[in-house]
Each structure stands twice: as C-alpha cells, then as structure tokens.
From Swiss-Prot:
SUPFAM superfamilies: Anticodon-binding domain of a subclass of class I aminoacyl-tRNA synthetases, Nucleotidylyl transferase
Binding-site residues, ATP: 272
Cofactor: Zn(2+)
Organism this protein belongs to: Helicobacter pylori (strain G27)
Record: residues binding Zn(2+): 27, 207, 237, 241
Gene Ontology molecular function, alphabetical: ATP binding; cysteine-tRNA ligase activity; zinc ion binding
Intervals of motif 'HIGH' region: 29-39
Quaternary organization: Monomer.
Protein family (similarity comment): Belongs to the class-I aminoacyl-tRNA synthetase family.
Compartments, record wording: Cytoplasm
Record EC number: 6.1.1.16
Protein name: Cysteine--tRNA ligase
Length: 465
C-alpha cells in the first residue's frame, strides 16, 4: 500500500506502527451548520482509504470527530437562544443522515470535543509546566511557537498571508502563537470550570487530545498512523496540532498526513464566506446519494474537483453500466475473477488511484457483457460476475442497490402504481392488436421521462434523467 504523505511531499509505502493494523484520525465538521460538498468529499475520500486497507487485510480503526465547542457554535447558539449542546446535536444528526445517504461507513468512534475536556486540560498543563505555553492578562493561554524548531514543517505556509488572516492578538508574543485555552469572558460566552480557570479549549488542542484518547497504542501513546482531513485544514489547524504534540510529548503526532483537495463551484473555491456553499442535503434533493458518491469519488482525492451537473450526469453512466450488468445476472454468488480483484485493488493501493481503478472496472463491464452475449445461460459466469460486482460494492461503495430500485429512483409509490397501470393498459392494447394505442402509451410515458423496455420476462421501466 502506497499513500501520498503531505509532510514528506511524496508517495511512500504505508508501514503502520503495528503490523496489519491501521489507526486513522479524520478531522470531522464543526457542527454549527449543515454539511456541504466539501465535507462529503473528505468523508468519501477517507472512506475509500478505509475500504482499501480493510480489503488489503488491515484491521482499521477510523476515528472522525465532531467539534462541538467553537466560537461559531457559541455565536449561533446565542442568536437562536439555544444551548451549544442543543445546536450542535441538530447538526450532528444532519451530518450523520447525509453521510448515511452517501454510503460512508460509520467510523469506529465519533468523539465530541466536549467529552474530552479533562484530557485537553492535562495537555495544556503539561505545556505550561514545560514553559512552552504562557498566559496573557485576560486569562487566555497561548503556545509559544518559538519553542518548536520544526514549526511550519508540515504546511510550509506563506506566513505573511496566513497570519494576517488570523490577526494579531494583544499580548501574544508572536503572530503565529496560537490559543490553547480561552478564558470565560462573561455574557454571551461559554465556559467550563477547570484547574486552568473557567474557560474553554482552543480548536487545535481539541483534536490532538481526542487523537490520543481514542487511538492510543501501548507502544505509541501519542502517535497514530494517519491523520487526515481537507486541504483547508493543513494550516493552521494541522500544523498547530503537530506543533503542540511535539512540544508536549516529543513525538510526531502522525507517521503520515493525508489531505483531500477542494471542491470548487464554477471554478471558485466553495466556502461559506463566498456564499457559494452547496449543502449535501440540498444536493440530495436532486440526486440520490449513491449518484453523488459515484461522482465525488471519480476524481483523485488530492485533485481539485470542480462541481458541475454535466460531469455528474456523465459519471452516472458508469453506475448505469454497473446496474445494467447486474440486471442481466441472477443466481448464486460465485468466485471472484482473481485477476480482476488483483488489478483493481492494486490501483487503489497506489494512493487511491481511482481513475485507473475505474478504467479497470469499465473494461470488466465491457468484457463480461460480451461473454454474457455469447453464453447467456452460463451459471458459473453469472456467479463470477455477481462476485465481481460485490467486490466493487465493498471497495468503492457503489452498486449495492437492486437494479429495479436504482432505475426507478425519484418515483413515488403512487407514481409507480400509475406507471404499472399504464403498462397493463398497453399490454391489453397489444393483445387487441391496437398498436397505435400501445405506441401512444409508450410516448405518453416517455414524455414524463419513463422509458419502457420489452423483455422476454415482460415489460420493465426506468426513470430517465
């Protein structure tokens, strides 16, 4: 297995801390709003990583957190006259629904920052004891980044650009020093009683503490195999996580860092500040979750994905081919084609080279359709095809529906009954040799984007996009 490590900026062999075990931490959402397509892409990218590792024989522990203590959450909660727990729980449920619709496997653990305050306080106390952290007059605690000679080694950031965005806080020693603990400021603030005084943790200390508390190993209590997230988290979030871990415990937080690329809308980075966020729940109103997943995984995870509906519909044709083949076969699951399994898995083991994997898939779909044309009753062939498709379902998370359900997506139960009635009416017309009426019914349904197909088993139908 080879992965691209952001820190070393090269593709490297994956050599976990414990043989054939992989522990992965993926930065999850700050739950103050609904999740957008950027969140979806990150979740799908590292779901593919997990699936690939599992099918390669690794035991995977994947943790994805919820940041439920944050300025944005506090501000919105006060505006809506809610507690931060009430507000965050709404968006945690929304995020979970969205990812279920995208067929993202449930993480091994989903910790909330609010559940690990004691661990955060202990880590800050360690940094204070080592004289690496300092307190300013308003009670806030910052980390002195000059104490970390490797600061900036992960992101190699443009400091003048990034720090001007962060802004200078009075009494900070340097602009890049970052907050570990925010003291309670009174009205319209949230604070927790602690040995550090009443207050709340900074964003970066939250994730580091959750990493150690959920993924600690006996031989590496402060290091994990892979820390992953969106490219927008590289600086300052991941840089600061790595920094405070080195300062507190003298080790690198992760052996490998992985980052997925941005999602652009009309060639512009999607962000709430630009007002061009595309929420997952809104996309799901127009497209089934499997169709969205298929589209979002079709571009290599490190590349920028420029979202547009034309490309989405083109990518849907790949799903159509999977289900067309699935429609042709039934029976008992057979043995997978070993060459197909080896070839497609090797593609994914090469830093999730999904483009190459999809090319292998397309080739398999074409060749097996040809074999079926020549041997339509070959049970062994059908069993092999079913096994191949089952492996695709496990590896890529697509192709898991019944074909009739897939081709009838977006049609209500009452509409289905109306269509079946029309099909029955057409059948009677054909029996009575009234082919003009039969053709008229077909055209009527086609005008409503319902296509009829006559097969030896009877007439079937599907919804056109």
């Amino acid at each position: 297995m080879f992965i691209y490590d952001t820190k070393s900026k090269q593709k490297v062999p994956f050599e976990p801390l414990v043989e054939k075990k992989a522990n992965i931490y993926v930065c999850g959402p700050t739950v103050y709003d609904d999740a957008h397509l950027g969140h979806a892409r990150s979740a799908i990218a590292f779901d593919l990583l997990r699936r690939t590792l599992e099918l390669s024989g690794y035991e995977v522990m994947l943790v994805r957190n919820f940041t439920d203590i944050d300025d944005k959450i506090i501000n919105k909660a006060f505006k809506e006259n809610k507690s931060i727990q009430e507000l965050s729980s709404v968006y945690i449920e929304s995020y979970t629904r969205d990812l279920n619709a995208l067929n993202v496997k449930k993480p091994s653990l989903e910790p909330k920052a609010s559940e690990y305050l004691d661990a955060m306080v202990r880590m800050i106390e360690t940094l204070l004891e080592k004289n690496i952290a300092y307190r300013v007059s308003n009670g806030d605690i910052y980390l002195d980044t000059t104490k970390d000679k490797d600061y900036g080694s992960l992101s190699v950031h443009n400091s003048s650009m990034e720090f001007s965005r962060i802004g200078l806080v009075q009494e900070k020693r340097l602009e890049q020093d970052f907050v570990l603990w925010k003291s309670y400021k009174g009205d319209n603030d949230v604070g927790f009683d602690s040995p550090l005084g009443k207050g709340r943790p900074g964003w970066h200390i939250e994730c580091s503490s959750m990493v150690f508390e959920t993924l600690a190993l006996a031989n590496a209590p402060y290091q994990i195999d892979i820390h992953a997230g969106g490219a927008d988290l590289l600086f300052p979030h991941h840089e600061n996580e790595a920094c405070q871990t080195r300062c507190a415990f003298g080790v690198e937080l992760a052996k490998y860092w992985m980052h997925n690329g941005f999602v652009n809308i009309n060639n512009e980075k999607m962000s709430k500040s630009l007002g061009n966020s595309f929420f997952i729940k809104d996309a799901l109103k127009n497209y089934d979750g499997e169709i969205l997943r298929n589209y979002l995984l079709g571009v290599h995870y490190r590349s920028v994905l420029n979202f547009n509906e034309e490309d989405l519909l083109v990518s849907k044709k790949r799903l159509d081919k999977i289900y067309r083949l699935k429609q042709r076969v039934s029976g008992t699951l057979g043995g997978i084609n070993p060459n197909f399994k080896k070839e497609i898995l090797e593609c994914m083991q090469d830093d999730l080279n999904v483009s190459k994997a999809l090319s292998v898939l397309e080739s398999m779909l074409s060749s097996t359709n040809e074999k079926l044309d020549q041997n339509p009753k070959n049970k062994a062939l059908k069993g092999e095809i079913l096994a191949n498709l089952k492996f695709i379902e496990e590896l890529l998370g697509i192709g898991f529906k019944d074909p009739s359900a897939y081709f009838q997506l977006g049609v209500s139960e009452s509409e289905k009954q109306e269509i079946e009635n029309k099909i029955e009416e057409r059948k009677r017309a054909k029996e009575q040799k009234d082919f003009l009426k039969a053709d008229s019914i077909r055209e009527e349904l086609l005008n409503h984007k319902i296509a009829l197909m006559d097969t030896p088993q009877g007439t079937i139908w599907e919804k056109l996009f």
